[in-house]
Amino acid sequence: MKQNIIIILFILLFSTTNTKACEVCGCGSSNTYLGLLPDFKTKFIGVRYQYMNYNTVMEMDASQFSHNYYNTTELWGGVNIGRKWKILGFVPFHFNKQIDDDGITTNNGLGDITFLANYKLWNKISVKGNSGISQQLWIGGGIKLPTGKFDVDVKDPAITVADVNAQLGTGSFDFLWNVMYTVKMGNWGINSTINYKTNTDKEGYKFGNKFTANSIVYYKIPQKNRWSISPNAGLLYEHTAQNTLGETVIDATGGYIANVLGGVEIGNHKISFGISAQLPFSQHNANGQTKLEWRGNGHITFAL
């Protein structure tokens, strides 16, 4: 029964999505966002959905514009190995759409598959007053495989930043590093994560490395039958370096963005689902020509 539910939900999400990279921004196709992980004891599998909307207006000619939509449906899962290790896997499917002054273009398919391995470096439980304080520190890393389609000739002078960003993958093996810290006191908790992604090149073309940091505060409200509701809020910061072709820096790529985020998680020991949204309060992408409107995330996840 559980397997049938997972398959049905995956099909429903897969059939309603629609994406695209910005015309001149350095967003790229791969964006592994962890958020709040489900609090299951052993292993889990689920489906996540991510939406992003970017708008671009060319600085020198306002008649040249693009509205870019990233929608990603992602199969994800994790398994705890002993008490120290957590292995995570992500299989994304992108549905790309761009509306610009030249018309509408789409590009859909499998993205770059990612695997992460995290090690619990520190675990401390202490008592303060009537409340216990739990702290955990995880460190880890992973690899992003070039499974997404990347079929442009980057050395062709007619190829634009938009053509490269529209690809379903980066065409390269890329590496991820992360640190996660969680502290819980009573029903309150804070989850903070730092990620850094280092990219290799595809035929000399290299997407800019990306630094991401976020911190989320949540409050767990117990319900009947072991259910709980956890509203959450936090901040996220991303900085992406400019793309390069050989030793040449590609103009109108890279930038930073700072978002405020909020959401809610609902679950028990067998199932978890949640939604969240992000709104930018400061950003500068592609020389200020590209702006993020908002991001949305949702998931449904099952313990196995």
What do the PLM-derived regions correspond to, one by one?
Residues 19-48, 52-56, 125-136:
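Outer-membrane beta-barrel biogenesis signature
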Residues 35-36, 47, 75-79, 89, ...:
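Residues on the lipid-exposed face of transmembrane beta-strands in outer-membrane beta-barrel proteins
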Residues 41, 69-73, 108-115, 135, ...:
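Residues that define the transmembrane beta-barrel architecture of outer-membrane proteins
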Residues 43, 84-87, 124-127, 187-190, ...:
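Repeated loop/turn-to-beta-strand initiation elements of outer-membrane beta-barrel proteins
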Residues 43, 47-51, 89-93, 139-145, ...:
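Transmembrane beta-barrel strands of outer-membrane/channel proteins
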Residues 50-72:
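Surface-exposed strand-loop-strand hairpins of Gram-negative outer-membrane beta-barrel proteins
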